[in-house]
Amino acid sequence: MEQEAYRLISEANRRLKDVGFLFSWKFLRNVNNVKEVGNLLIRSAILFKAVKNWELAGYSFLKAAVLQSQESDFVLDTAINFVNASNMYRKIDPKKSIECLLQAIEVYKSINNFTTAAKHQMTVAEIYESCIMDLEKACMHYEYATEYYREEGSIKSANDCMIKVADCFTRMKQFDKAASVYEQIGIICMRLPILKHRIKDQFLKAILCHFCIGDKDMRLIVGYYTELYAQFIDYREYTLIMKVVESCDTCNLDILVDALREYGSVTRLDYILTIMLLEIKKNIQTQ
């Protein structure tokens, strides 16, 4: 199988070499030439993928995409093969994987397919977040995805991306920026019945971020959010917030610990909430 893959890629390279230059005008004027050589490269890529030769699979898909990008009849094929190349490189070279995805995104934007472009921006962000550990760039690409989904009117998907943005700010301990984004998400959710269940969670996180920043008049800030969303006082999240206020006012960590135990018995404390609460605990200890 791998031997056949090498034969196919050699044949593709020979045909490209015969015309003297990959992007020879004479060669590219013939759509069939692009199609035939592109097919050779794709077939070789599929075989390399089957034997888990990720580098040559990625190389072959990428070369096919670059070739097809020169002919307008192959716009979707170009984008698909940039994505295929990215998937192969992701296993061995995350940065190269991102480069391929960014090229695919540009193709999808050129044909006004912002939904697919947004989906791939999310993938770029996830690679930065989980493979390269660059939260700033992850945040930037989640923001791009948010913009693209909004462009297409996909409010729920845009909100999902905004949550990722806010979570990245929290992980970087940029609590002022996180608070602003969580608040925006909560306000957007208030306008959409399908997202109303998210309001309390986003306002909880926004308020906790204000605690993390060290804002002094927390009762005033809590009042601002209850004015925005009067039903907030009916939820367990509000009860937790008021216990945190009491704990901060009295510098009594036991109140915070008891409140978290009670809240956590019903609702799991996720990683993002844990970051915030540890920061609040540290602030109380240093008062």
From Swiss-Prot:
Keywords: Protein transport, Transport. GO terms for biological process: protein transport; regulation of synaptic vesicle priming; SNARE complex disassembly. It holds the Pfam family SNAP. The keyword Transport applies. The keyword Protein transport applies. Belongs to the SNAP family. This is Soluble NSF attachment protein homolog FPV033.
